């Protein structure tokens, strides 16, 4: 049995859309600031952010979701608006290590704001 390229691409697109849907649901459930955002807008933003994460070399779902969470907390353009985040993203380290650093960086920002 051979699967055509078109069929395979369709499966890949469906899998990516399912991931975007799950990521949007996770963000809406865990980021109170997103409560008032419509599902259509959120899905559009998540699709954009997932594309950005991939452009920085994030492949693993957990790394992409952490990138998306940082974006939800710091803003859609956090990678340009926060020099520290930009520095982390431009590092030559592994994607998982950079996702760890982004998560830590974001926590540090919020802890500084709370304290």
For each of these PLM feature ranges, what is it?
Residues 1-115:
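A contiguous, surface-oriented mixed alpha/beta subdomain in the mid-to-C-terminal portion of proteins
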């Amino acid at each position: 049995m051979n699967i055509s390229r078109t069929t395979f691409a369709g499966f890949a697109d469906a899998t990516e859309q399912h991931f975007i849907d799950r990521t949007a649901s996770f963000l809406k459930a865990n980021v109170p600031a997103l409560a008032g955002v419509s599902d259509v807008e959120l899905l559009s933003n998540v699709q954009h952010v997932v594309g950005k994460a991939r452009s920085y070399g994030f492949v693993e779902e957990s790394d992409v979701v952490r990138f998306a969470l940082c974006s939800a907390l710091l803003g859609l353009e956090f990678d340009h608006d926060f020099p520290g985040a930009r520095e982390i993203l431009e590092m030559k380290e592994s994607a998982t290590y950079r996702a760890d650093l982004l998560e830590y960086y974001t926590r540090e920002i919020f802890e500084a704001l709370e304290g």
